[in-house]
Amino acid sequence: MAGRRIIESEILVMTYDFETIMDRRGKDALAVDAIGAGVEWAVVPTKPKDGFSVIPMWVADMNFATVPTIPKEIIKRAEHPAYGYYLPTDEYFESIIRWHKERNNVSGLERKNIGYENGVLGCVSTAIKAFTTPGEKILLHSPTYIGFTHVLENTGRVAELSPLKKDENGVWRMDYADMNRRIKENHIHLAILCSPHNPCGRVWTREELEQAMAIFRENQCIVISDEIWSDILLNGNKHIPTQSISEDAKNRTIAVYAPSKTFNLAGLIGSYHIIYNNYLKDRMKRESDMTHYNSMNVLSMHALIGAYKDEGHQWVDELCEMLSKNINYAYDLIQNEIEGIEVSKPEGTYMLFLHCEEYCKNHDLTIDELIQRGWDVGVAWQQGAPFHDEWGIRMNLAVPYSLVTEAFDRLKHYVF
């Protein structure tokens, strides 16, 4: 196992390397290879002007090398020259159970509660088709993860958006009265909860989840709880699994997880659900079996096993320290040096969500013009409109600290 991280004064001495600037060009990386390439995938940043390198801050993956136990595990399996049919191993399930016990103090999780999903959105799609019909409304919070919007559109369902609201301290909060009203008025029986929330970065407290789940219980709503960001926690915040809130929450929730956000494995595809209720589990299995979609890749299985080893815990702890440093720097700089930009300090994820309405109106700019200014100097940030904020910009800060400071130097000198 890797050595322990030590802290000397305010300088972090880390076992793992989060400072090397990794060249991902030509290595199957949408975040860099798609820029300026005319790729039809959402709205892609344009190439920067001459003299500026690209700092990828749009696609939600990381610009760090993953924990070494993952490639080691993949290579060990790949060296055996047969890749035929197989079943998930005991080690796969035991790794998941152990990870949730050690990270989130989950007890009572058994192999029968775990099911493979070919991506978190694949799970969401299966659940939507299993428990709703085309034309039905589904409750979500806005700002909203763009992937949810696409799944609902592609399956013929309708998003009923309950806006998150900022309190007097600028913290995003659920509006419980609004949620309850929308559910009742639209006869909604399925809700999607993003915990931690993307793009706003909220790590919901137990009390907040208790209030939300009480509303879902009152209205007999099944809940899809997307907890893919649950390992990415900033500044000491703690994730509360939705299913841990109560026995009722445990039985009405389809929770979905993956090592992909935590360990930068999105290209390998491999998520899993946790379902305790037999009725929900059977309906999900039936819908999934109809498409033959959820077939696990053997290398994805071994990637998860490698990720969820002991070294993975330390790697994630160090990652969260580095991401906290990045987030704190960016948040403080915006608050102190850039007028007219609203930003809430994320508690989880590595995304920063900017609201730029005041700035744009004060400077007679459209949001598209502001975004293009960033792209022109290599700050490849992302439009916020697909997340239901027409004045929004989403920034991925999972890059080395030196690139975070470089990005904001460019923003200060050339953009804002």
What are these language model-derived features?
Residues 79, 83-214, 231-232, 237-244, ...:
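Conserved core of the PLP fold type I
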Residues 3-13:
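Short, Lys/Arg-enriched N-terminal segments with co-localized hydrophobic residues
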Residues 362-416:
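PLP-dependent enzyme catalytic core of the Aspartate aminotransferase-like
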Residues 323-324, 328, 337-376, 393:
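Conserved PLP-binding catalytic core of the aspartate aminotransferase-like
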Residues 15-119, 126, 310:
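N-terminal small-domain helix-loop-helix segment of the aminotransferase-like
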Residues 252-336, 342-346:
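PLP-dependent aminotransferase class I/II
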